[in-house]
């Protein structure tokens, strides 16, 4: 980085020229994954993440370029910073620059800024908004260059994130010629990497080997381009994804080797979010190896890291992995809580495909789900995944449907879920301790009364308490149980005067 700064001579530049040159260099360093370099180059204009750049004395058009650049950098750097509000800051800066470009009628710059804004929304999991913005940008970005390629890649990433793999594949393959002729090695690498990710998700039992081999070939092309771009962070992404493919091929030892190298690279870059992603993959490999304790520990740590960042889609993914590990360890309640958190996190940011996968996985992994929760989970999963083009997901949905039918047949009754909003049955809700204690108390007493055929005397004996204490609890705290006990029969004076054996003494109030 010192070499870069030493070569950066600004003595012959005006303030406006220097600002534009710093922005240009910062974006080049971004493509290399050089966080420190970016901040060093931008320092005179931008002091720190979350702060507004200093545009004093700059021409309005140059100030807009600075705002756009800092917005792009903030969006990018937030992938390794523990700042939940980073994306909001990025959106505000980019939007401000966009408004300036609109005011001077520069439609190309408006489209470019809108494309970068779309990336911010994608990072937050707002897939519908991101898709719309990318599509609107591409209408204006007609020139075959890096800017159009970046917008096309963003659209493909959104479709992949939404599990619309065939659409993502078409977007990438239809524009292969453009990505072949662009000058950015970083963009070329990202193109081949995304194509590999799509091919992997479109693998079916009949084409699995072919698709996975094609994916590995694309990853090799991606690694080559990222090496030319001198970007170790993106190379780590490639190695993480190759590790995932090796897991699918049951080559676990090789998978761990790739993942260790990926984690080393992200560690050098101090990119905590990407490190958590790699730990998610490591946990999945451990699960495949049936090393569930190791998987749970690694996934739990990844959840802890992502909870502190704004990467909700990534958090939802890792929560699902953590839920699987907990379920395999027979910790059903903790597993259900993890799955329900994944559903809630994904649902809140509009990543409905991820919410659907979480609900589907909960059905698959937990045998003791209530009929209501099971039905609600399937109802939501089937709706949220209705546009998915993954053959694997369709097979899993069919298996889940059979499980729901079997549960209904066994229980002999239909689930009592409100049709208008079945999601409530599968979300974690705040717990009122006093209410829950009363509910549990009522359940225990009801069972005792049922076993005692409504006899308060015998129920009290079963519960190791006095008749008077049980009667008081029912009358004061559990009035709904009054109908469960035998009717109170008052004794006449004659009956009271004649001693009787305990078996002959009727229930008293």
Where are these regions (language model features)?
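Amphipathic alpha-helical segments of tetratricopeptide repeats
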Residues: 43-54, 94-102, 106, 135-141, ...
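TPR/TPR-like alpha-solenoid signature
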Residues: 16, 20-23, 61, 68, ...
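Tetratricopeptide repeat
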Residues: 38, 44-48, 90-97, 117, ...
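Short coil/turn connectors between adjacent alpha-helices in alpha-solenoid helical repeat scaffolds
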Residues: 27-40, 74-90, 119-129, 159-168, ...
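Bacterial C-terminal helix-turn-helix
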Residues: 417-509
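Residue register of alpha-helical TPR repeats
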Residues: 20, 58, 65, 112, ...
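Residue signature of alpha-solenoid helical repeat architecture, marking inter-repeat boundaries
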Residues: 16, 61, 66-68, 88, ...
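Flexible inter-repeat linkers and adjacent short helices
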Residues: 1-93, 97-114, 134, 138-141, ...
């Amino acid at each position: 980085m010192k070499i870069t700064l030493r070569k950066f001579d600004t003595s012959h530049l005006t303030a406006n020229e220097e600002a534009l040159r710093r922005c240009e260099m910062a974006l080049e360093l971004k493509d290399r994954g050089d966080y420190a370099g970016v901040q060093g180059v931008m320092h005179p204009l931008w002091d720190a993440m979350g702060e507004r750049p200093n545009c004093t004395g700059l021409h309005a058009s140059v100030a807009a370029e600075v705002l756009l650049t800092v917005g792009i950098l903030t969006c990018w750097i937030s992938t390794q910073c523990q700042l939940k509000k980073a994306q909001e800051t990025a959106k505000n800066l980019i939007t401000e620059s966009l408004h300036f470009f609109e005011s001077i009628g520069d439609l190309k710059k408006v489209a470019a800024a809108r494309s970068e804004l779309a990336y911010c929304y994608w990072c937050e999991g707002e897939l519908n908004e991101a898709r719309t913005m990318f599509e609107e940008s591409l209408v204006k970005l007609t020139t075959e260059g890096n800017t159009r390629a970046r917008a096309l890649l963003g659209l493909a990433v959104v479709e992949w994130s939404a599990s619309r793999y065939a659409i993502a594949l078409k977007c990438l393959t239809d524009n292969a010629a453009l990505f072949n002729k662009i000058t950015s090695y970083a963009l070329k690498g990202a193109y081949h990497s995304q194509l590999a990710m799509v091919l992997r998700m479109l693998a079916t039992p009949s084409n699995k080997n072919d698709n996975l081999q094609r994916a590995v070939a694309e990853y090799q092309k991606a690694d080559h381009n990222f090496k030319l771009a001198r970007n170790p962070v993106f190379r780590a992404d490639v190695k993480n994804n190759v590790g995932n493919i090796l897991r699918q091929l049951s080559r676990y030892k090789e998978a761990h080797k790739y993942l260790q190298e990926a984690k080393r690279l992200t560690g050098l870059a101090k990119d905590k979010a990407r490190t958590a992603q790699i730990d998610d993959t490591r946990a999945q490999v451990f699960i495949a190896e049936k090393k569930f304790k190791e998987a749970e520990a690694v996934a739990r740590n990844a959840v802890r890291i992502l909870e502190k960042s704004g990467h909700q889609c990534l958090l939802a993914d890792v929560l699902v992995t953590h839920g699987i590990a907990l379920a395999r360890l027979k910790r059903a309640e903790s597993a259900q809580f993890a799955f329900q958190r994944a559903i809630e996190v994904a649902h809140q940011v509009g990543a409905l495909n991820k919410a659907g996968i979480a609900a589907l996985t909960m059905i698959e992994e937990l045998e003791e789900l209530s009929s209501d929760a099971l039905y609600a989970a399937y109802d939501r999963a089937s709706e949220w995944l209705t546009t998915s083009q993954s053959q694997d997901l369709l097979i899993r949905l069919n298996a889940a449907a059979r499980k729901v039918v079997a549960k209904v047949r066994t229980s002999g009754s239909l689930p009592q879920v409100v049709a208008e909003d079945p999601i409530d049955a599968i979300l974690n809700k705040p717990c009122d301790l006093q209410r829950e204690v009363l509910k549990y108390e009522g359940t225990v007493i009801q069972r005792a009364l049922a076993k005692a055929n409504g006899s308060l005397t015998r129920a009290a004996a079963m519960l190791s308490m006095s008749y008077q204490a049980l009667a008081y609890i029912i009358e004061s705290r559990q009035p709904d149980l009054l109908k469960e006990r035998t009717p109170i029969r008052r004794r006449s004076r004659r009956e009271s005067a004649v001693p009787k054996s305990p078996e002959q003494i009727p229930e008293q109030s």
